Amino acid sequence: MTRRKLLSIVPGAAGLTFCGHLFGRNRAHQVLAFYYGWYANPDVSGRWAHWPEGIAHEPLIGRYDCHDPKIVQRQFEQAKSAGITGLIVSWWRPGDFQEQGMPLLLATAERVGLKISIYYEAAKPRKSPTPEATEDDLLDILNRYAQHNTWLRADGKPVVFVYARALNELHLSGWEQVITQVNRRYAGGVCFMADEISNAASKLFDGIHSYNPTGQTANKSVDEIRAWARATYPKWVATAGKRISCVTVIPGYDDTKLNRPGPRPTTDRHGGETYRVLWQEAVAAQPDWILITSWNEWHEGSEIEPSKENGDRELNATPEFARRFLR
């Protein structure tokens, strides 16, 4: 079952020691989309995975399998053509269905010309997370995959995005230990990106972001969404300071098929205008990176991958803004 914290704000911790790497603000722009490799069907994997849990829209190409090389090739070519420079791949645990697909994702990304990072979703071990176990888990991931040519890097360091759930499980004090020890044990260090917009996070991590702003854009008109983004995005950039600043755009949000307790924070697509307005304000805010939530989070209706209901409307809108931002 999917889950998302809608706007990541974790209370700051006084007295944290800076563990990240100081970056200047003159760095290459990126347009990165969150990617979910957890979908399976009987034709490829012998079973259904994730599709039966509920989806807001139907994929235009049908309920595909993320272990199908033809599907991944098609997705990555579409993303590349849209001006997306890389994908942030959801990561849960070693040996699961998503990790089994990682070699295919990396090989396809290299062939197409995309970068890959991971979204570290949960600290380890699951029942009682500790900084020590999380350090070991991250080092295992980095040692197996981060030397790949297509892994996203910043200042020469492999990038790892950390989701709010993982942040909350260890708190910032625990992540201080994780970052310190991983940087000590991994040659050259790592660029950690926190799913939290706060001064405390920007002091500890190498960059900050927010996975999904639907908690703030829900039930708003296009004009209200624009006003929110115009007021908020520059604050996100300012909070990052000299760290990597990110602004997140969404096409909409609808998780009402997941049987979650209501009321749900649904953001209307407004015929594609939600996405366009957020992109306009994101470019104007001049962050380092723009994040798209999402390429294919079908459970929460935030996908820009073509659907039967929305066609390729948002995907086709992406190149205009990506080119403007990346030039």
Annotate each language-model stretch with its function.
Residues 5-24:
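N-terminal export signals
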Residues 25-327:
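Glycan-processing catalytic domains of CAZymes
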